[in-house]
Design a protein with these regions (language model features):
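Preference for the N-terminal adenyl/adenosyl cofactor-binding alpha/beta module
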Residues: 4-195
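Conserved phosphate-binding elements of NTP-dependent enzyme cores
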Residues: 198
Length: 198
């Protein structure tokens, strides 16, 4: 029996091309997150402040969720996040995100009944349960043109977040965030290697 294992090789893709592609896409996503993180960090008034460090991690998670949600169809249509933010120049991105996060955290029946009249694009966003957007005390810094371009062009237009492997990307994403703040903020992720040992 030990010598006949080769007969089952057709069941396993020895080249692991699919896994390698997932890994590369996830690494590319991690690189984008790292660039966004670094640009955001430069905008904080006191980046060493504990609240600022926790905020940048929360903001990074929220932005990545929105990028993934628009590509994976969670928001209802492709490019919804992108289309909403393109309405605003860099100077107004901060307030646009604050409003968006508030809407994502509010059940549709609890929203301002005139929201669709005031901002139809914003009103289209669904409610996202789970508390990801519930912390209104998050510090969101001002955006620069470079940061706006990085988010809208590089991370939204030029990248398909629905192609990432959540298992692989989780480990990559976590490694881009400040390790000390991750421990304080309770962020945990099980790597792909850990899953294979279960």
């Amino acid at each position: 029996m030990d010598t006949d294992y080769y007969r089952l090789e057709f069941l396993v893709d020895k080249s692991n091309q699919h896994l390698e592609k997932e890994k590369q896409v996830s690494l590319d996503a991690g690189e984008l997150v790292g660039k966004i993180y670094d640009e955001l960090l430069d905008q904080y008034k006191d980046p060493n402040n504990e609240h600022s460090q926790k905020s940048i991690n929360q903001l990074s998670v929220r932005l990545v969720f929105c990028l993934y949600a628009e590509d994976a169809g969670i928001f209802g249509r492709k490019n919804m996040f992108h289309d909403y933010l393109t309405q605003f120049d860099a100077r107004h991105m901060r307030q646009a995100l604050i409003r968006l996060f508030k809407v994502l955290d509010t059940k549709i029946e609890d929203r301002d009944p005139y929201l669709a009249d005031d901002d139809p694009t914003l009103a289209e966003f669904p409610y996202v349960n789970g508390g990801m957007f519930s912390d209104e005390d998050i510090e969101i810094p001002a955006f620069t043109d470079k940061l706006r371009n990085l988010l809208l062009r590089n991370a939204s237009d030029d990248f398909d977040w629905s192609q990432i492997s959540p298992t692989i990307f989780g480990a990559v994403f976590e490694s881009t965030l400040n390790p000390e703040t991750r421990r304080q903020g309770g962020m945990h992720y099980t790597s792909a290697v850990s899953y294979t040992h279960l």
